[in-house]
Amino acid sequence: MWPERGVNPLDQARQLLRHLADARVQYDSIMLDIEGSNWINGSYTAIQNQDFVMALVNAFTEAGVPVAIYCSWQFNQTFGSNFTSLSRLPLIYAHYDNIPSYVDIADSPFGGWPSPSGKQFFDGAGGEQICGSGALDWDWSREPWW
């Protein structure tokens, strides 16, 4: 889920869950894609961003839906360097270094995660695709996190 920062987080969570139920979609978890200028454009403080993302996480958790977090090193800029409330959730981070390993995060951990659950290591900028799918990002993990 790409949360729209200017829209009520509870409404977004409820709407997504309603659409998934209406479409009878089976899923194991919801991944919150926390990145981009809508989080760090100066309109919101780190505390406001913390409250927003925790409202989303709590809404899904209360509905019995597991949550994972997708983000990058912008995390500290978005939430502040002392925010660790998400560290109990699986972390999938982006670092487009074309290396499928976690060696890069060991030197620059963030968010209180002891280790990530997955890494997006290639962004498909060359237009790589499968069966006309459009550009693909490539992810890696040591073991399934979902």
Give the ranges of each region predicted by the language model.
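Structural recognition of the beta-strand scaffold that forms the well-ordered cores
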Residues: 1, 28-34, 66-71, 90-94, ...
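Active-site-adjacent substructure of cysteine-protease-like catalytic cores
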Residues: 53, 68-85
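Functionally critical loop-and-helix segments that line ligand-binding/catalytic clefts
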Residues: 86-146
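Short, well-ordered coil↔helix boundary/capping segments
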Residues: 47-50, 70, 109-112
